[in-house]
């Protein structure tokens, strides 16, 4: 098993001032452990109208700085916030890149992430026929820029609609995405 440690933006109400210090301590204690593989999942989530963008940005930058300092890749949650995430990554220039979890952006955003050393995580959402823009974007990208992920038990693929998602579905997801 491998571990990544981070403070997710969907739980902003639960994060406290001391959490960044605690995260820094956790990472420092595990830096020599090869099972500590990344900082994450963290990022920006602008989906809700009540999203505190300033607080999220501060938490995002603090964790990105930890990733840079620890020389660890980042697992990033990005929802309706690609422009801000890309701009921030350009300022910090993390040497290890990482993965954009559940990528849903444009071809231009995909290219920017690639330049910054990030791969794009794809899973069940990309198998849905109504995900037209995402499917068109995937078709334009080189396979080595993509990473399969399940986000189990959530984000089930179209062929397994309204059921619990599972890593066992990855071969079929890969087949469907390869056909694009």
Language-model segments: which ranges?
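Divalent metal-binding pocket/active-site signature
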Residues: 9-116, 136, 141, 155-168
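Short, acidic/turn-prone active-site loops that include or flank metal/cofactor-
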Residues: 7-9, 104, 124-128, 152-153
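His/Asp/Glu-enriched, well-ordered alpha-helical/loop segment
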Residues: 143-150, 156-180
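His/Asp/Glu-enriched short active-site or ligand-binding loop at hydrolase and phosphoryl-transfer sites
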Residues: 117-131
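Structural detector of well-ordered beta-strand residues that form the stable sheet scaffold
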Residues: 2-4, 75, 99, 121, ...
């Amino acid at each position: 098993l491998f571990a990544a440690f981070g403070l997710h933006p969907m739980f902003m109400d639960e994060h406290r001032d001391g959490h960044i210090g605690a995260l820094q301590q956790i990472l420092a204690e595990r830096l020599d452990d090869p099972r500590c593989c990344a900082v994450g999942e963290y990022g920006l989530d602008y989906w809700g109208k009540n999203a505190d963008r300033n607080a999220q940005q501060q938490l995002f930058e603090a964790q990105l700085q930890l990733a840079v300092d620890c020389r660890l890749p980042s697992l990033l949650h990005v929802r309706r916030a690609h422009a801000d995430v890309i701009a921030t990554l350009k300022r910090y220039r993390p040497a290890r890149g990482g993965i954009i979890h559940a990528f849903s952006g444009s071809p231009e955003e995909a290219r920017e992430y690639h330049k910054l050393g990030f791969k794009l995580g794809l899973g069940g959402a990309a198998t849905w026929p109504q995900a037209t823009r995402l499917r068109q974007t995937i078709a334009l990208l080189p396979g080595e820029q993509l990473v399969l992920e399940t986000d189990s038990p959530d984000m089930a693929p179209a062929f397994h609609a309204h059921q619990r998602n599972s890593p066992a579905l990855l071969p079929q997801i890969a087949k469907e995405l390869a056909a694009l």
